């Protein structure tokens, strides 16, 4: 995904792109290649002094990079006062139109809980607990349910593999 307006949800389907840009007179065509397979934006890295610094977690996990480039991968955790050097590093980004609560075990009043794993009912990012499936579903679920609910909560997501990218996106999306 890359056709998103600043700080809003990233589109994962052609109709999401249309909704963002339907009033833009410069947009004349949208190519529909189906839903995105990964569902999250790319991993952004900085190659510096024979090191791979992860600036933004994405579809390629730190573990996958470490497998290909042992002892060269460094995770960069952005500090509040650091300069933004890559897309998606704003503290508030990827946000739905309604409040989002993260690491929720139960829904609060007037709130939809989006689950993860076998202990949650529908809607569920992945009943099987697949982080790849959850990443693929994340933005399309948020786009769909922000139109139907005034508040959304998301169950805890393991912070490993592509789960780091999922948690990064929902943490930024939950900022007010």
Predicted regions and their residues:
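Active-site-adjacent structural elements in enzyme catalytic cores
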Residues: 1-176
């Amino acid at each position: 995904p890359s056709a998103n307006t600043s700080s809003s949800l990233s589109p994962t389907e052609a109709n999401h792109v249309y909704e963002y840009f339907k009033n833009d007179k410069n947009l004349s065509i949208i190519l529909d290649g189906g839903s995105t397979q990964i569902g999250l934006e790319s991993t952004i890295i900085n190659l510096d002094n024979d090191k791979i610094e992860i600036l933004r977690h994405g579809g390629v996990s730190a573990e996958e990079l470490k497998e290909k480039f042992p002892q060269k991968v460094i995770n960069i955790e952005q500090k509040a006062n650091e300069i933004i050097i890559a897309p998606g590093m704003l503290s508030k980004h990827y946000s739905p139109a309604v409040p989002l609560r993260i690491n929720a075990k139960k829904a609060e009043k007037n709130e939809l809980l989006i689950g993860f794993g076998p202990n949650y009912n529908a809607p569920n990012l992945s009943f099987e607990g697949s982080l790849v499936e959850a990443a693929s579903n994340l933005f399309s679920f948020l786009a769909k349910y922000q139109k139907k609910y005034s508040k959304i909560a998301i169950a805890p997501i393991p912070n490993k593999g592509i789960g780091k990218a999922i948690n990064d996106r929902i943490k930024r999306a939950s900022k007010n």
